[in-house]
Amino acid sequence: MRERIANLSRRELLKLFGISVGTSLAGEAAWPRKIQAQSRKVTPRKNVRNVIFIQNCGAMSPPECLDFKETRFTAKDLDIQTVNSDFVISKAIFPNYEKWAPRATLVRSFYENSLVHSSAQYHTQAGRALNAAILREIPAFGSVVAYELESERRSSDTFPTFVSFDLWNARCPQIGSGMLHPRFSGLDINTASVFEAFGAGEDDSAAKNSVLAERWEVLGRMSEVSPSGGIGGKANEYKAHYEYAYKILTDARFKKVLNLSEQDKARYGVSKDRGTCKIGLAMLLARNVLAADAGARFLWVANTYNGGNGPADNHDQLYGRGALAPKGAQLSIYESGPRLDAAFSSLIEDLSKMPGKEPGKALLDETMVCMVHEFGRNPEMNTNGGRDHWGPCFTNLFMGGGVKPGRIIGKTDGYKVTDVGWKFKEQPMIDHVVSTIYTALGIDWSKKIVDTPSGRAYEYQQTAPLGGPAFIPSTPIEELFV
C-alpha cells in the first residue's frame, strides 16, 4: 500500500474518487449565496440525521417487483409471497425480502415526464427537469444538502457531507455543484478502483504518511508562488477536491471504511457479482462511511453494474436465462433482483443493529433510506421479451428514520394511477422525493437562491419547471411520516 500511496498521480487520485472536474460553475461560484425562504408556513421536520439514496439505474420493472401485477406475460416460477394486504413480492427475485419488505413503505403513484435514461437520471440527480439553458449552474441536490448542512459540521469532520458511490458509471454521471462552491460537489468513490489504489485499509505506516505529507506540502508551495490571479475557478475546483482527498487519506477512519471482511462481502453478494461496479461493495462502503461518523450524512449509491443505462434496462429477455440471458450492461430479473436484494437486505439488517448517535436508537432509526428509479416499465411485454420505458406510473421505496413502516401510498392498475395516495390531484415526482429529503434533514424546501449567474432564481423545489409538467405542488410527501 505504501507504493500505491506514494506513486498516486493527480489523474489517478481524481479517477479513484470518480471526480468530474468541469461540472461546476466554479468561476462564478459564491459562498455564501443569497437565499430567501418563499413561505413562512414551512417548518422542516428534521427527523433524521442521515440519508442513503439508492439509485436503481435502468428502472427495475414494477410489474415483477414493487407493484406486482400477474398477467399473461408473468413467469410462473416467481414464488409470490404476501408481505401485507397490499404488498406481494417474488421470493425468486428477492430471496431475502423478509429482512426489509415488512419495514418498507412504497409510493406507487410516481410520474416521470422524460422517458430517456440520460435526462431522467439527470432529473433524479438534480431534483428537477433538464433545462439546457441553465444546465451549468444547476447543482446536484446532494450539493444543496451539503451546502445547507455546512453549519452543522464539526471540527473533527473530514469526510464531505455528500459522498456517492459509482455515479461515474451511470448514464448521467455526477453533475457537480453548479453555481455552488466546489466544496459542495461531494466525492464519488469508484468501487472498481478504490481497493486497488488503497488495498483493504492495511499499512498505516509512518513512511507512507510522510510521503503523502511531503507531496501535499510541495503542492501548497506551488500554489503560494503562482502568479497573482493565476489560479482561476477551475484550479480552485481542483484544489477543493484535493483538500477533500487529503483530509480523507490522512484520517484513520478512512482505512477502517475500506476494511471489509470476507464474511461481509459474502453476505452482500460481492463474490457473485460480475459487474465492473459491485452493488454489494457500494452498500458495504456506504454502511462503513456512515458508521465512521466522520462528516458524511448524505450518501448516494448508484446501482450501475457495467455502466450504460443500468442493469435493469430490460428491453429484451427480462426473464432470460442461460443462452438467452442478457449480456453486457443488462441483467435478467432473475439476476438483477437477487444481486440487489443480497446487498440491500444486508445493509438494512446491519443498520438496524448498529448503534446510532442518540441513546437507544439504531443507525437505521436515524437514517432515511430511499430506493429510486428514473421511471417505470411498460405493463405490456414487447416482442423481444422485455418491457419498454413507462412514465404514467411507477414505484419508489422508503424506509428507516422518520418513515412509518408498512404503508402503501397510491394505487395503480399497472397502466395508470387509480389513487394518487396523497392530498393533491397531481402525481408525485422525483421533485417531491427531494423536498421530502430536505424536510427530513431539517432543510426548508421552499427556499430559493436569487443571485444566480443567469439571473433566474433557483428554487429548491420547482413548481412550474421548463421541460416538466405545467404545475408541481410544492410539498414533501408528508404521507410517509404521518
Where are these regions (language model features)?
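Ligand-binding pockets and gating/stacking loops
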Residues: 1-482
